[in-house]
Amino acid sequence: MMSKLGVLLTICLLLFPLTAVQLDGDQPADLPALRTQDISTDHSPWFDPVKRCCSRYCYICIPCCPN
């Protein structure tokens, strides 16, 4: 039984090596187009200054309010 698990683990590691997993440093920046533009969320009509987040249209305004 243990040898079967060892063979299965070896096959899985050969098919999906750990180097294929991206680390946090390799992740692309989320919404890079919004980061390059000078968009102030404080002036957005959907920004709620009390909650300090956007209540609607989260693809335009960041950060989104939790539902």
Curated annotation (Swiss-Prot):
The keyword Hydrolase does not apply. Disulfide bonds join C53-C65, C54-C61, C58-C64. This is Conotoxin TsMMSK-011. Expressed by the venom duct. Belongs to the conotoxin M superfamily. It is found in: Secreted. It holds the Pfam family Conotoxin. Residues 21-50 form a propeptide. InterPro entries: 4Fe4S_Fe-S-bd, Conotoxin. The cysteine framework is III (CC-C-C-CC). Classified in the M-2 branch, since 2 residues stand between the fourth and the fifth cysteine residues. Keywords: Cleavage on pair of basic residues, Disulfide bond, Hydroxylation, Neurotoxin, Secreted, Signal, Toxin. The modification 4-hydroxyproline is found at P63. One of its GO terms (molecular function) is ion channel inhibitor activity. GO terms for cellular component: extracellular region. The keyword Secreted applies. Residues 1-20 form the signal peptide. It comes from Conus tessulatus. It comes from the Eukaryota.
